[in-house]
Amino acid sequence: MAEEFKATASICGGGGGAWWNSPRSVMSPSDHFLSPCFGAAITSNDFSSQENHLKSRMTCTDNNNIVFGQREADSDSGGSTVTMDSTLQMMGLGFSSNCSSDWNQTILQEDLNSSFIRSSQDQDHGQGFLSTTTSPYILNPACSSSPSTSSSSSLIRTFYDPEPSPYNFVSTTSGSINDPQLSWANKTNPHHQVAYGLINSFSNNANSRPFWNSSSTTNLNNTTPSNFVTTPQIISTRLEDKTKNLKTRAQSESLKRAKDNESAAKKPRVTTPSPLPTFKVRKENLRDQITSLQQLVSPFGKTDTASVLQEAIEYIKFLHDQVTVLSTPYMKQGASNQQQQQISGKSKSQDENENHELRGHGLCLVPISSTFPVANETTADFWTPTFGGNNFR
């Protein structure tokens, strides 16, 4: 184990140069997974001095080692495979590999030298997170001939998958992946091509912005202008609404003015309320009075106006005579003469009409002229009738 560690250390750090030149590894989230050879790199000047060591380790004879980096030749490229051993056994990982392949020095001279030189140039700028040789194209699981190799290669492939990292780890100068000299980059697995596209999207973003999804960009490009409302259309609709509002306001104002003019033309009636209360006077015609009298005397069977008036006059005279007869005993002045005349006249009439009585004529009314002397006399005289009072029943 010590000899193998020395051999790998001589391979990785033979000239003091840096092979992958990155403060962090892209392969895994932790820096403790990788072997110490990832902290150094083989430059173009030191690569020739390490050829003898590479020739001595052309095959993978130890089953405890795992093929870490491998490049398999396709039928079109015509190249040979490149393998590289890293003792992950020392790191505590029990991976095994049964594959054996050869190193082709010419491919390493052509492909790796260009990428190594550019990675060393990126070191001067202080941005070495994404490098050309640390891309997932080094790993190719096609060379594994045992289940242990395929499982280990799939496990390592998961470490190569890109994970979300802060913006300050993205390298803007790692453009050597797009170099046309690396023709083997286009002949890898589809899984590697997806990872390659993700790394390019991170590296080409100069402002360290998150990459956009291609489907979303195509959807934005395929949108038609009819889906969006332009500002001139909005302005035109607003102007139309304003004109309509102005028209309606003008119409309402014109209607209000017309109503005001009509109300001003009509003058209100000036009525001065009278201070005295108004009494309603009933107007009656002579004909209405006659008809009312006829209705009163109609039971008698006389509809003639003259006959009705004559009857009323006779009845009034009779009432007047009755009042005078009843009021004479209560009057002292001229009562004696009047009483004697009346008594003599009544005695004659009683003889003629024995059955004639004042009680049969109804209510007796007293005239106003006879009430004045009665009111001036003493009250005792009313209850002590004088001569002739005994004639009344």
Swiss-Prot record:
Stretches for region Disordered: 248-277, 332-356
Molecular function via GO: DNA-binding transcription factor activity; protein dimerization activity; RNA polymerase II cis-regulatory region sequence-specific DNA binding; sequence-specific DNA binding
InterPro entries tied to this protein: bHLH95_bHLH, bHLH_dom, HLH_DNA-bd_sf, IND-like
Designated name of the protein: Transcription factor bHLH112
Location(s) in or outside the cell: Nucleus
GO BP terms in the entry: cellular response to abscisic acid stimulus; cellular response to salt stress; cellular response to water deprivation; positive regulation of DNA-templated transcription; regulation of proline metabolic process; regulation of reactive oxygen species metabolic process
Top-level taxon of the source organism: Eukaryota
Quaternary structure (record): Homodimer.
Record's compositionally biased regions (Basic and acidic residues): 254-265
PROSITE patterns linked to this entry: BHLH
Annotated source species: Arabidopsis thaliana
Residue ranges, compositional bias (Low complexity): 332-347
UniProt main location, coarse: nucleus
CC terms in the record's Gene Ontology section: nucleus
Keyword terms: DNA-binding, Nucleus, Transcription, Transcription regulation
Domain bHLH: start-end pairs: 270-319
